[in-house]
Amino acid sequence: MSTVEEDSDTVTVETVNSVTFTQDTDGNLILHCPQNDPDEVDSEDSTEPPHKRLCLSSEDDQSIDDATPCISVVALPLSENDQSFEVTMTATTEVADDELSEGTVTQIQILQNDQLDEISPLGTEEVSAVSQAWFTTKEDKDSLTNKGHKWKQGMWSKEEIDILMNNIERYLKARGIKDATEIIFEMSKDERKDFYRTIAWGLNRPLFAVYRRVLRMYDDRNHVGKYTPEEIEKLKELRIKHGNDWATIGAALGRSASSVKDRCRLMKDTCNTGKWTEEEEKRLAEVVHELTSTEPGDIVTQGVSWAAVAERVGTRSEKQCRSKWLNYLNWKQSGGTEWTKEDEINLILRIAELDVADENDINWDLLAEGWSSVRSPQWLRSKWWTIKRQIANHKDVSFPVLIKGLKQLHENQKNNPVLLENKSGSGVPNSNCNSSVQHVQIRVARLEDNTAISPSPMAALQIPVQITHVSSTDSPAASVDSETITLNSGTLQTFEILPSFHLQPTGTPGTYLLQTSSSQGLPLTLTTNPTVTLAAAAPASPEQIIVHALSPEHLLNTSDNVTVQCHTPRVIIQTVATEDITSSLSQEELTVDSDLHSSDFPEPPDALEADTFPDEIPRPKMTIQPSFNNAHVSKFSDQNSTELMNSVMVRTEEEIADTDLKQEEPPSDLASAYVTEDLESPTIVHQVHQTIDDETILIVPSPHGFIQASDVIDTESVLPLTTLTDPIFQHHQEASNIIGSSLGSPVSEDSKDVEDLVNCH
């Protein structure tokens, strides 16, 4: 990745050129990376290699004038060997307590994820040798080891799973096969002989490890859930009858062979359950020290045969013995201290200092060494799993992005100790807060292009947008209020990328004036409800946009639309409706137009018009419904159901437990269900209590229902911008919760153990 940053990790950019987006059939935003075009790449950059990912302009560049800064990215061609990477954009506003600096700019922090560089899809000789070997014998392993080859073991990272799934999809597409299960479970070995070697490209793992992973992913019987007492009894009977014929036992129980094998391994007829007695603890300690030739008080975490320990203890299984010793008894005997919140923050910082690309590369033994409050390396890793679940979609972000988010979260909690203790109540403001920060995360993942279209590389973007109130340094006690907006609908939203700004209170409670560094003002209404949908209403002038929170009832039952546009020197992103696109991929295309200037709009227009799109894309027109008035303001809604994508959110450990108790409720009259996940959690963005003098950082989208699909503008039905009135002040408290569904419950201990056992194979 190329930037012009010098001593800092932060660079300041202005709009350089336009970028083209589309949307695929799965609802992903697609960033098209144009080839070397003299119109899109400056002459001084033309000599640069064509394999850059992003090109950013520096604030110090002499070509940048004093215009209001805007966000822009010029995408240059991606090479065929390029892999997915992560970009974290952080919009930072530094303002005085009572005024906004004219020099305030929008900054972008780039976080490069190079962890896939070592596992290129083309593969080096080393990777190819490993990923093409089954390792069926010890001689195979020894042979490659003696040649200096190394390979990954243990848990699979998210990036590895992404590579595996992408390889499988390419294999199916090339052979016209719709379902991978046809190959895995129905074809003979001869028919699928090249399958596993093909999908293993780019993975530094033996073929047998890939084979086991694929079986677990596609065998539905492997995800049935926890064994019931009845199944345990049935399993015991089948084990006596069939011995180690795991396939037969699994078929009888409706579970996979690997699942029943692992469950039998952990099962013991004579096991006690519940609280350990003092006699059991004493016997466990004696057996462990005897088998490891250690003294009482010594720390023992490795080299223990738990099967042998369980046999000597007699009343507990090997799983119970291992858990009791590593999570409590050894720590108690060695005089350990209690784990504190400071230890949790210290763990995050220590992991960040390791600078590893994947958590599977962490040496937990080394990390736990000399740490008195750590009960064992295994316990420390379990503690890390608990910590990272504070990020709701921790499974969907890369490890560097996850670490960065956790560091920011705990830094905020350190500066604001009452943040999570009183989300809706009152409290004292933070005197250390002198700036407002908003994080906008963009995840860029490489996609395979359609063979029917010219082979240009592309990348998919997912943009969680979060809104957080940040109180002033001298403000009195106030309540914390935050909302999270997620973007991913049937048609793309029209929204404006704004420079940095702050929020000025108005005379109406809950309504603020969004003041940028220019003269533009954007009144904004926010409610205390943690789940809101922001909708654009009629502007009072060409310089303003009204944003109002609507309740889900109105979103579902009306079809009124309105689209507004600020004709100011900003970057406007617009879209077209799906039905208007003549693309074989059924994609939608939109452009970031960076060439808008005030001179382009000498007079306020009488009607709103769409930006110019490429010739091959129909030009949708944007109109304001004539029925727009005070009575209909609460009826603005999406014409089509919207699927909200997951955003990076913060959850406390208590909320994680509470979330597990919630049940998913299907919406009654949606063709496509709203999907939200634990939106009541505080966001990852910096938050403190809010008062009338609060400052806020946000990027405002308009929901996709505000995109008018019609190609014809009825000029008689379009009201002049200056004649529309502000209707929202009477309705600013009409928001209510969207139907939510809880996050998946934390993995049970049984399933975790099964996963650990499999990873050892």
From Swiss-Prot:
Residue segments, region Interaction with CCND2: 1-237
Residue ranges: DNA binding: 306-329
Domain spans labelled HTH myb-type: 268-333
Any GO MF annotation of the entry: RNA polymerase II cis-regulatory region sequence-specific DNA binding
SMART domains from the UniProt entry: SANT
Induction: Expression is induced by activation of the Ras-Raf signaling pathway, and this may require JUN and JUNB. Expression can be repressed by E2F1, E2F2, E2F3 and E2F4. Expression is also repressed by non-classical inhibitors of NF-kappa-B signaling such as doxorubicin, daunorubicin and UVC, and by the NF-kappa-B p65 subunit (RELA).
PTM comment text: Phosphorylated by the cyclin-D2/CDK4, cyclin-D3/CDK4 and cyclin-D2/CDK6 complexes and to a lesser extent by the cyclin-D1/CDK4 complex.
Mutant lacking the gene: phenotype: Mice spontaneously develop tumors with a mean latency around 80 weeks. The most common tumor types are pulmonary adenomas, adenocarcinomas, hepatocellular tumors, B-cell lymphomas and vascular tumors. The protein appears to be haplo-insufficient for tumor suppression, as heterozygous animals are also prone to spontaneous tumor development. Mice lacking this protein also exhibit enhanced susceptibility to tumor induction by activated Ras or the application of dimethylbenzanthracene (DMBA) or ionizing radiation.
Superkingdom to which the source organism belongs: Eukaryota
Annotated CDD domains: SANT
Positions of region (Required for transcriptional activation): 87-170, 459-761
Keyword Phosphoprotein assigned: yes
Domain named Myb-like: residues: 225-263, 339-388
A GO cellular-component term linked to this record: nucleus
Start and end residues of each stretch annotated as Disordered: 24-51, 584-625, 740-761
Main location per the UniProt record: nucleus
Subcellular location: Nucleus
Region (Interaction with CCND1, CCND2 and CCND3): 176-761
A single BP term in Gene Ontology: positive regulation of transcription by RNA polymerase II
Subunit structure: Interacts with the D-type cyclins CCND1, CCND2 and CCND3. Interaction with D-type cyclins may modulate transcriptional activation by this protein.
Role, per record: Transcriptional activator which activates the CDKN2A/ARF locus in response to Ras-Raf signaling, thereby promoting p53/TP53-dependent growth arrest. May also cooperate with MYB to activate transcription of the ANPEP gene. Binds to the consensus sequence 5'-CCCG[GT]ATGT-3'.
Protein name: Cyclin-D-binding Myb-like transcription factor 1
Species of the source: Mus musculus
Name of the gene: Dmtf1
